[in-house]
Amino acid sequence: MYENDNDLRSEKNLISYVSDCWNVASYKLPMSYKIDYVMYRDDSPVGFAEVKVRTHTFGTFPTYIISLAKVMEARRLARETNTKSILIVSWTDRTGYLDFFSHHQIRHGGRSDRNDWQDQEPMCHFDLKHFKGIGIR
C-alpha cells in the first residue's frame, strides 16, 4: 500500500539476486496474496517469500519485527501448498532469510510515522539468530 517505485525496484533487485543464488524463478504475486513472491524450481512451486530491503546494518535492532497477520498468511500458504514460506531481508551489510515457522514473540506495536492507526497491531519479533545468510552480499 505504501510501496513506492524505489522500494519496488530494490525489492526486485534483491529477489533477482536470491533467485540466482538458489536457482529458482520468482514471480511477484498480486496484493491479494499478502506475500510478495512465489518461487519455482523446474516448474514446481518450492515456496513463498516476503522481501524487505532495510537501510540500516544487521544488528541495529535486537529483533526483526513484522506483522502477525503477515506471518499467519505466510504460514497458511506454506501449509496449504506443502512448501516453505520465508522472509528475505537485505540490510546494508548482509542479506539473510528466516523460515516463517521460526520461534518468535508477539508484542503490540508497529510504525508511528505515517499517522495511520492501522500501523499499530500485534507484531512478531524474530530473534536475529534465526536468520541464515544468502550468498556473499
Show which residues each predicted segment covers:
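Acidic-basic catalytic patches of nuclease active cores, encompassing PD-(D/E)XK
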Residues: 1-31
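N-terminal targeting/trafficking signals and adjacent low-complexity tails
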Residues: 5, 61, 80, 86, ...
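A structural signal for short, well-ordered beta-strand segments and their strand-loop junctions
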Residues: 28, 48-50, 86-90
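Short acidic/glycine-enriched loop/turn segments that link adjacent beta-strands
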Residues: 31-35, 93-95
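Conserved catalytic cores of phosphodiester-cleaving nucleases, focusing on short active-site segments
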Residues: 37-39, 43-57
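Mg2+/Mn2+-dependent nuclease catalytic core
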Residues: 54-73, 77
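Nucleic-acid nuclease catalytic cores
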Residues: 75-104
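Intrinsically disordered, low-complexity terminal regions enriched in charged/polar residues
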Residues: 96-137
